[in-house]
């Protein structure tokens, strides 16, 4: 017989199967990796602010052009921001179903 202790312990069959992780599918949506440098964070804030400002300006110009082309005044309605607790659109009134 060989001297010294055994190199490997005896393993139970199926013991390794418990720890297997199945690969999960990809999640939807874009992913943004948070930067670690303060300068990059500042650049991203500036970029986002500029994008919002440009989008708002374009929307304003479009509404101005649309209101001048119509014979009556165009009113733009904005929906109030919803709380995070109330997700989704309000449910319609329940009517008699057949």
Curated annotation (Swiss-Prot):
Residues 1-30 have a biased composition (Basic residues). Pfam families: DUF2462 (PF09495). It comes from the Eukaryota. Signal peptide: none annotated. Coiled coil: none annotated. Residues 1-38, 63-98 are annotated as: Disordered. Belongs to the UPF0390 family. This is UPF0390 protein zgc136864. The lineage of its organism: Eukaryota, Metazoa, Chordata, Craniata, Vertebrata.
